[in-house]
Amino acid sequence: MAWKRLILFLFIFSVSAEAQEFRINKITDLDAPWGSTFISNKELLITEKSGKIKLIELGSGNVTEVIHNLKILEDGQGGLLDILYLDEVIFVSYSEDHGKFKSTTSIARANLDRGELKFDNIFVAQPPINSGYHFGSRLAVKDEFLFASVGERGKGMIAQDP
């Protein structure tokens, strides 16, 4: 039994002894960052709840705001939420402004353009309501399918009535 412990100890020690060093750089000038996605080995897109999309150049630390056409209502837990890059396409989830303080969770896509992203909605949750809660909004891709979490907006019965 003692030899098993010795092997485990040596394995753990050898793995940690060969661990690579890494460097941590702090990204500043962000306001309530929510989601992030790498678009290359050297570039990262970050969403801010207020509605801004920031392009971060990892080597220089340069931060640039990317213009977009989304109608975002930042209210309570809502705003510009998750972001995902896949094959030159950017997907975002956000609380879409429908006027008169009504909003809903929407998902949009745009072709990658570092200067301006022109989004088109591919999903709009119904109905838009006056609530700043439970938008959900995490995005993931598996086997070429886009998955999204969508909240019940603090109105539990909406989720029970498809």
What residues fall within each predicted segment?
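Sec-dependent N-terminal signal peptides
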Residues: R5-S14
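Acidic, Gly/Ser/Thr-rich repeat motifs that build Ca2+-stabilized beta-propeller blades
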Residues: A19-I158
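Short, flexible helix-coil linker/hinge segments at the edges of structured domains or between repeats
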Residues: D161-P162
